[in-house]
Design a protein with these regions (language model features):
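Contiguous beta-strand segments within globular domains
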Residues: 337-364
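Beta-propeller blade termini and top-face loops
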Residues: 1-325, 330-333
Length: 365
């Protein structure tokens, strides 16, 4: 809820960083900081989650299942990586990037997955095992989890995807799991997106790049994964890192590919590239800051980018004839900032003001 809000991102060999959602400007001191860093080799940053009810509680993961909770006021972090109960004589496997998340229904509840799925209701202080060894697929034996998700519409509706294409669903918060992997590929399931509008709909993407397969694999199911339909449409045939559903409109989907970000306004029937000045690099992840409607995306090697979704939403409404006129929001004026010398204001403020206008096509300008 800060203004500007903070963006968190994991890097390769340079730990995890965070900073304000402002455009970078070299007239000011660098505002980005390390959330953590290994003093010897930097370390690899993976997934960062912020408690939605407490900005001072931040979770961050390192490679191979390591997970920590940090108090931003004290600067102290503690390890909260789950362990198998002593009575289970088995190995706990993790991929380099381990899926975990804060429940949409309770900010004290966490889920964390390797070849087993764990649940905590006390912010990671203790964990409960809520699955069997899910890599023991009937025909897709795997090593560990690639993706884990919970429905925003139904508490305890969980989805699990492995690194070899096995897909599991639990409708009772892990009490029982059912495999639903038929007629999908054998790739690394990187992204599972339960619909925000229909609880039986779930999207899933997988990549074969780990196995020298550069094809695209994108699916949708309208019955909790029992049956799958391919959703590639006219997307380039290249690895897909994630699939996301828009926060406000169920027809709008976003896909992060090996070379670029794509958007669909018709639920995957057709796709267009999004962001004309975005480098053609691998788009690895995406989040939406709800109060500003900003999309934040991460790339591999080309940094973090921010894109406001309001113009896209207005275009979609106009295309669907939902609104007769485009309504543009009022401009928010921002005072110039003083630079670090405190002698003169920086008139070309980096807090840009969007200007929207409409031209009458019947006239010449």
């Amino acid at each position: 809820n800060k203004v500007p809000y903070n963006i968190y991102g994991g890097t390769q060999d340079d730990a995890t960083v965070y900073g304000p959602a402002d455009e970078w400007n070299n007239s000011f001191n660098e505002k980005w900081k390390y959330l953590w860093i290994d003093a010897w080799d930097g370390g690899d940053g993976c997934i960062t989650r912020v408690d939605p009810n407490d900005n001072n509680t931040v979770y961050f993961s390192l490679q191979n299942g390591a997970l920590r909770r940090k108090n931003m006021l004290s600067g102290i972090s503690v390890s909260i990586k789950p362990k198998l109960p002593m009575i289970i004589n088995d190995n706990l496997n993790y991929n380099f990037i381990t899926p975990y998340f804060i429940s949409n229904h309770d900010s004290n509840t966490l889920y964390h997955a390797g070849n087993y799925v764990f649940k905590s209701t006390d912010r990671g202080d203790s964990w409960k095992l809520i699955s069997n060894n899910l890599i023991n697929s009937s025909d897709k034996p795997s090593f560990s989890a690639g993706a884990l998700a919970e429905s925003k519409l139904e508490k305890g509706l969980l989805y699990y995807g492995s690194d070899r294409g096995s897909f599991w669903v639990s409708k009772n918060d892990g009490i029982s799991w059912e495999e639903r992997s038929e007629k999908i590929g054998n790739g690394y399931i990187r992204s599972i997106e339960p619909s925000k509008f229909n609880k039986s709909v779930v999207y899933m993407s997988m990549t074969g790049i780990n196995y020298d397969d550069l094809n695209s694999y994108l699916y949708v199911s309208d019955n909790y994964g029992k049956n799958w339909k391919k959703l590639q449409g006219n997307l380039p045939n290249e690895p897909i890192n994630f699939i996301r559903e828009d926060e406000n409109f169920e027809d709008i989907l976003y896909a992060g590919l090996y070379r670029g970000l794509y958007v669909s306004l018709d639920r995957g029937k057709s796709w267009n590239i999004l962001g004309k000045n975005l480098p053609m690099s691998s788009v690895s992840d995406m989040e939406v800051h709800k109060s500003t409607n900003d999309m934040i995306i991460s790339t591999h090697g080309r940094g973090i980018y921010k894109f406001n979704l309001n113009p896209l939403h207005k275009y979609y409404l106009k295309q669907e004839n939902i609104s007769d006129e485009l309504l543009f929001s009022d401009m928010e004026m921002v005072l110039p900032r003083f630079n670090d010398t405190h002698k003169e204001p920086l008139m070309d403020t980096y807090q840009k003001v969007p200007i929207s206008f409409k031209l009458n096509s019947k006239k010449n300008y």
